[in-house]
Amino acid sequence: MSIKYVASSKLPTPWGVFTMHGFEDSDTGKEHVALTLGTLDANTPILGRIHSECLTGDALFSLRCDCGFQLQTAMQNIAEAGQGFILYLRQEGRGIGLLNKIRAYELQDQGANTVEANERLGFPADMRKYDMILPMMEKIGIKQVKLMTNNPRKVKAMKELGIEVVERIPLQVGKNRYNEGYLKTKSTELGHMMSEYHFTGEEKE
């Protein structure tokens, strides 16, 4: 995999002014982004998140998943901490792409869960890869992290790449009547570390 740094710019947000760093994967043509806030010290554990692209949740405010809620909460937590990072990876639909994600949603509308839908389309439950994060982390100068995630695969990926995960911080937000089944499947079939008793915030109607 060949990840090339392209450019950086300021990104004003409701939670503060982040710096946006652009990267290109010359093998796939995909473009990834790292957001950083504050002064980052390689010798200090930095609060952060690996976030896979979710157009429906991040930009279209879908209640079918918890992705948009997690992204916003992560950015808010980083702003409150005064420093941190988000690696925004272009792996829509756990790696199957947007149109296949819509096809999977169609199957879910007919009763399949999120894993069954992917498998009926001929895909694994989760196709995401995380090897691109190492050059991104090296560029922004982070070696130790406090990782906001419920996904043990992300913790494992960072450790295998030589990045020290000092702490895993649960990020359980956004539960509502449209995504209860999805969240249960993520916990029971994808191994995400979640408990319904730990969700925060009001349920959406």
From Swiss-Prot:
This protein's UniProt keywords: GTP-binding, Hydrolase, Metal-binding, Nucleotide-binding, Riboflavin biosynthesis, Zinc
Pathway connected to this protein: Cofactor biosynthesis; riboflavin biosynthesis; 5-amino-6-(D-ribitylamino)uracil from GTP: step 1/4
Signal peptide positions (record): none
Record-listed Zn(2+) binding positions: C54, C65, C67
Catalytic machinery residues: D126, R128
Co-factor remark: Binds 1 zinc ion per subunit.
Reactions accelerated catalytically: GTP + 4 H2O = 2,5-diamino-6-hydroxy-4-(5-phosphoribosylamino)-pyrimidine + formate + 2 phosphate + 3 H(+)
UniProt key word Oxidoreductase: no
A Gene Ontology cellular-component term: cytosol
Domain of life: Bacteria
Record GO biological process: riboflavin biosynthetic process
Protein family per UniProt: Belongs to the GTP cyclohydrolase II family.
NCBIfam families noted in UniProt: PRK00393.1, ribA
Protein name listed in UniProt: GTP cyclohydrolase-2
Species this chain originates from: Shewanella sediminis (strain HAW-EB3)
Lineage of the organism: Bacteria, Pseudomonadati, Pseudomonadota, Gammaproteobacteria, Alteromonadales
